[in-house]
Amino acid sequence: MSAKKQKGRRPPVWVSQNFLTSHKTIERVLRRTNLRADDHVIEIGPGKGHTTGRLLQKCRKVTAIEIDGKLYAGLLEKFSDAENLRLHHQDFLKWKLPFSGRYKVFANLPFCYTTDILRKLTESKNPPVEAWLTMEKGAAKRFLGKPRETLRSLLIQPKFDLGIVYYFRREDFHPKPGVEVINNAKIKLW
């Protein structure tokens, strides 16, 4: 199947999934966040769990949503003893966000779903207090309204503080992404 959307069908996640595998980079990115020991963090697409393990050490509760069956099974095995992990085998776009309570989001987004996921997070009745999202540079700039405002940037900016906090190297991922630069965008509720 082509990576392009076909008549309302979404491409499979694997067509745009690049796993963040550099442990040094994961540590660098996590140090730049405001994640604390008492936080509840929702991780979208934990993949092989490279970041999940660090989130479990750093935060009170981690809820991870993984759509891929093989990756989900691997996560179940890898984190079988983790008491502060709630793991869901589900499509995040169909998963219900918490109706109440504070939570933060950390995600290495599949590039073809960035807009859909960002829309779900920002249009929720109980949006995250912060979201740390790894996305393609061009998408991040569009959400920031650079070089010019877009409808999406105009809708997001009044309620959320957006910014780029880290530029990745392609070598930080496997497989290496085909896009020029990957970055981590911070979205904070005003």
Protein language model features and the residues they cover:
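Catalytic cores of RNA-modifying enzymes
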Residues: M1-W190
